[in-house]
Design a protein with these regions (language model features):
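Pocket-flanking alpha-helical
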Residues: 41-72, 94, 178-180
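A conserved helix-loop-strand patch within extracytoplasmic ligand-binding domains
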Residues: 78-127, 229
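Short helix-initiation/N-cap motifs at beta->coil->alpha
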Residues: 35-46, 134-161
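Ligand-binding "clamshell"
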Residues: 66-78, 91-94, 165, 170, ...
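A bilobed periplasmic-binding-protein/Venus flytrap-type ligand-binding module shared by bacterial periplasmic
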Residues: 85-96, 200-213
Length: 246
């Protein structure tokens, strides 16, 4: 017996693949999950705000908060599902403990990913940032650089292709996957409890007041189930990681 229909909006192939895996598990519990795909990052929030769609699964916490602030919308988090860790990958060097003076590290040149790269380098003890910088850190916020590391800013999708020309590179999970790299190849990864992951964990979002909607709760429960965690781990090899927190 089908208890109810739940509509969920998504954008990327990753989110759609995960939701297709969820669909059968939802059906087994009597839910008809309808997936509505979009090609931009605005419409999925518009249809949730309007009530046309129950939930969406495509964005991280930081984007949701910024969207609410900019648009005056009332989106809320129903569940934290996964994160896509940035990794520090070896190029001409592979041992962080023996990093040479003046080593070149390729980093994404966009604001968000550059900040995450800098926070990762700080977590590994390679640089020290102004403590006030947080997830808005830029190269100007580096207050200690004992190894005289030289940052090489590149478009995020280009970093993996330039590893042979630099000593290390900080690569987004999706681009690492496209380059045939896995998390096991990285010499360092963002940790689940890092400041960056708390802001960039991907969530199921609903309109405020619908967090406890029965269908939404069923969706979140299944997205956080062992079956879906196994699906993510097997298919994305550490480039996408299930979030174990609440």
């Amino acid at each position: 017996e089908t208890r109810c229909g739940t509509m969920v909006a998504s954008t990327s192939l990753l989110h759609s693949e995960v939701q297709e895996a969820v669909k059968d598990l939802m059906a087994a519990e009597g839910w008809d999950l309808e997936i509505v795909e979009f090609t931009d990052y605005v419409q999925p929030n518009e249809v949730v705000e309007s009530g046309d769609v129950d939930a969406n699964y495509f964005q991280h916490v930081n984007y949701l908060n910024s969207y609410n602030e900019e648009k005056g919308t009332h989106l809320a988090i129903a569940g934290n599902i996964h994160y896509e860790p940035r990794g520090l990958y070896p190029g001409k060097q592979s041992d962080l403990a023996a990093i040479t003076d003046g080593a070149e590290i390729a980093v994404p040149n966009d604001t968000t990913n550059c900040a995450r790269a800098l926070l990762l380098l700080e977590a590994e003890g390679l640089i020290k940032l102004d403590p006030e910088a947080g997830i808005t850190a830029t190269e100007n916020d580096i207050v200690e650089n004992p190894h005289n590391i030289k940052l090489v800013p590149l478009a995020a999708e280009q970093v993996a292709r330039t590893l042979e020309d630099v000593d290390f590179g900080v690569i987004n999970g999706n681009y690492a996957m496209e380059a045939g790299l896995t998390s096991a190849d990285a010499v360092a990864l963002e940790s689940a409890d890092s400041e960056a992951i708390q802001q960039y964990v991907n969530v199921v979002a609903v309109k405020e007041g619908n967090e406890n909607n029965e269908g939404v709760q069923a969706l979140v429960k299944i997205l956080k189930s062992d079956e879906i965690k196994d699906f993510i781990n097997e298919n994305y090899k550490g480039s996408v990681v299930p979030y174990d927190g609440e």
